[in-house]
Amino acid sequence: MGINSDVSRPRARSTPNMSKKFQTIGLIGKPHHQGTNQTIEKLHLWLTAQGYTVLVEERVSAELEIEFQAVDLVEIGERCDLAIVVGGDGNMLGAARVLARYDVAVIGVNRGNLGFLTDLPPDGFETQLAQVLGGEFETEHRFLLEAEVHRHGMIKASNTAVNEAVLHPGKIAHMIQFEVYIDEQFMYSQRADGMIVSTPTGSTAYSLSAGGAILTPNLQALILVPMFPHTLSCRPIVVDACSTIKLVVSPDNGENLEVSCDGHVHLSVLPGDEIIIRRSQQRLMLIHPKGHNYFHVLRNKLGWGSKLF
């Protein structure tokens, strides 16, 4: 049975122990997934045996058969030095949008499909994780997007995205009309099923499926990918990450639209609204085992050809 966290417990990180790079570790997982539960239990037992303080995210806590401290995702961000996300890239994205607000390192254990963001294997994670906990890791910062819906000069809704912000029809797929501005300069009008604005992190996700290029994570750039544009000449375009992108929805659109952030959060959009998408001040601090190679990940996940000689 789980032990809920004491509500009177101060939300502060542990007193530093100079012999350990990380002191308090949060475990986050894919809810209602047997494999994830097994991995979290193994991680919890392994980490506590080595003297770490371990917190478990409350959404997965009800299904575990060990004693633990159950807390919400915000408290993990406030109290932990390291968060381990067990699941697929979707679970990593959901956690990352919250954890990016805090100075907490994040690493993933892959219990999903491709797993571009989750480095550690669910079986035999101990060797690599021990090296990471011992200070042998590489740090990588990924920037986020901030998406805002403006209506009559006021911000009506906003959220952040690690992968992409997508303007699209609501419940029924159909063509929509909108104008695209980059740093207040008109680029073009579009008649399409929508527009994907992606970070380099998201360039191997929805953007890639829609025909966008892969951007290496260190690039300070965004890629705009029209979705099924009603023209033969429109192609994805890469712009500087410091650009402000404005999508102006035509008042002639007959139905309400949406902006999706990483496919998790949906912002309602009305005809005539303006969507402002820019680089967020928040950054996700990913850590990888030593020797992490992005092109090895691409080659492995996408089935690219191996060396010829």
From Swiss-Prot:
This is NAD kinase. NAD(+) binds at residues 89-90, 163-164, 174, 191, 193, 204-209. Gene3D superfamilies: Probable inorganic polyphosphate/atp-NAD kinase, domain 1, Probable inorganic polyphosphate/atp-NAD kinase, domain 2. SUPFAM superfamilies: NAD kinase/diacylglycerol kinase-like. The lineage of its organism: Bacteria, Pseudomonadati, Pseudomonadota, Gammaproteobacteria, Alteromonadales. Its cofactor is a divalent metal cation. Transmembrane segments: none annotated. One of its GO terms (molecular function) is metal ion binding. PANTHER family: NAD KINASE.
